[in-house]
Amino acid sequence: MLDPINWEAATDEAVNNLIRLIRVESVNPPGNEEPAVLLVKEILEREGFPGEAITIVEAAPKRANLVARLRGDGSQRPLMLSGHVDVVPVEREHWSRDPFGGEVHNGCVWGRGALDMKGFLAMYLQIFLLAYRRQQPLKRDLILAAIADEEAGFEHGSRFLVDEHRDLINAEYALNEGGAMTIHAAGKRLYPIQVAEKGVCLLRMSASGEPGIGSVPNTDNAVLQLSNALHRLGRARHLSIHSTPKLRKMLESLSSQLGFPLGILLNMMISPAIAGLM
């Protein structure tokens, strides 16, 4: 039987790793994510994680990506924990604290990337370290990915890995950023869940009409029919909203914690009649 996890010690370790990550200035543009990726590698190797299970690939000089793999028994496909190490630029004059200082103040870690998304990466790294230390039997491989170039187009990061090194990151499930930003409301700390981002809906449209020639146009030709349809689609502002079971469960849970009036408003969002008006 596995020993209980000392969550206080694990939290302290994750915070310390986050501070170290923030102090690496991996601003994108220009990128230069290599030092942050090498820091993750150093933390893993210091723990004794085998070097042959860590892969670093560069899409361009200094644009590095790290993928580490903890083996399971292979009965299920892998789970990937993925976080980007690059951050957006800073305007230091607008900061009350050093954006790359990683200071702890009022119970929070301050710095560029604390939320987006070195904080996530530090948590994923901690989970990965705990699973390795405990030698916990896994049904699937656990993949840790520290990725470049999320902030400026993905070309040197996730897109590069998908196009050139898909074997390293091929997984059944992936946890990334989004959703788990802390919400402080009604004196409570709440953690929402985000299942996915907006996607793409590909449509194929066809039309039929009366043929004709340019010198004698008619209002029933196929091109005009398609043009009218595209115009109506472009003007649509209130397309149908489809809430997933996971979203409804999250909103119900949040509403029960928030009480009146915020909880009532969240419950209204679940109502199909109200959601269609929002």
Across the structure, where does each feature detected by a protein language model lie?
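Short Gly/Pro-enriched turn/cap motifs at secondary-structure boundaries
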Residues: I56-A59, E150, I193-K198
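Predominant activation on well-ordered alpha-helical scaffold segments within soluble catalytic domains
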Residues: I19, L38-K41, A122-L129, R159-V162, ...
